[in-house]
Amino acid sequence: MKQTVLKNNLQNLLESAENILLLQGPVGDFFLRLADWLTANGKTVHKFNFNAGDDYFYPPTQAHTVVFNDNYDAFPEFLQEYITQHHIQAVVCFGDTRPYHVIAKRIANENQASFWAFEEGYFRPYYITLEKDGVNAFSPLPRRADFFLEQFPKLAQQEYKAPTPVHGGFTPMAKNAIRYYIELFRNPRKYPDYIHHRAPNAGHYLKPWSLSILKRLNYYIEDIQIAKRVEAGKYGKFFIVPLQVFNDSQVRIHCDFPSVRSFLLHVLSSFAEHAPADTNIIIKHHPMDRGFIDYWRDIKRFIKEHPELKGRVIYVHDVPLPVFLRHGLGMVTINSTSGLSGLIHNMPVKVLGRAYYDIPGITDQNTLAEFWNHPTPPDKELFHAYRMYHLNVTQINGNFYSQVFFPNKKTSNSSTPVI
């Protein structure tokens, strides 16, 4: 009997629906390129625009593009009627926790339309994510080892192969975001009742991004020196704690800590009380948060209250994460994709929030107090099966803000770059 081969979710989306509705995408023109690909493959693509930033990257002159400028409370009924009238079979968005997308998921489910969410890549760099019914901790995939071990024989690619590199990083995203927000705030009257998922003020972003550039230059030499010390073993035995963006949905929705700051202080308190005296802890600031928030004062205040930690807490900014992953004892995270990077390096990872990869056999399941003394690495066979499942099914080679490789119509094994 021939073994069923699992397909990538982009192919599954393509084969499961004829009439597809796109909601908000990532900043930039990725959804316009996605629509071109879907249309070239015989699909009818509809699009909702919610603000002038959406209009800029996905012009309302495109076929089947609808401007929704009514108030938020009117959206459920509007969407319900549109899905019914146009026989929508799939609803696609970027990020499943945005206000309009939360409603869209419910309405889609009530109307037997599938709901698909794009997200930044689970395995980075060079990947983006597409899942049915939800992403991150809302992913419907089982949190069971046996599921991924059972699926492994069905994968077309069972050995890891490096993806095609694409241009990424902060710069292309920032360029798209700046243009998006300029357009969003330039013409607010067209969408007077629009509710944004982030701070609705252009100055809120431009000033921190400018500060971010200055801080990166300021920390450049220091970060190089820290990286050299790590490689030389100057920090001895250490744990790495990668912080997440302060207002990220991963923090707001998928964990019980009220803030990244509260998570940081909780970890430091546990480390001070339970970690062996000969271990250190490295706190890594998130690069996207560089201009928005700084935790150095909190760390210094904590060390002052816990003098036994003097010289044992290191705060870094732009040192590449792999530098720490090659030498650290383990990682503590809320639910960052950095956890997956740690697991790739066979590093023990302790998750304190809700994460799609927090699975017995992959992450450490003991308490944080126990983790400092007995960190448990992932089961290699299980994690390989887990990783390869995602690379085959949920991950797509590319970057939202520069280039994505879409499969051709005739075969899912070949791909076409879309820039």
From Swiss-Prot:
Keyword terms of this UniProt record: Cell inner membrane, Cell membrane, Membrane, Polysaccharide transport, Sugar transport, Transport
Disulfide-bond pairs as recorded: none
Role this protein plays: Involved in the phospholipid modification of the capsular polysaccharide, a strong requirement for its translocation to the cell surface.
Keyword Cell membrane among UniProt keywords: yes
Domain of life: Bacteria
Name by which UniProt lists this protein: Capsule polysaccharide modification protein LipB
Gene Ontology CC: one annotated term: plasma membrane
GO biological process, one term: polysaccharide transport
Membrane topology: Peripheral membrane protein
A matching Pfam family: Capsule_synth
Main location: membrane
Localization, UniProt: Cell inner membrane
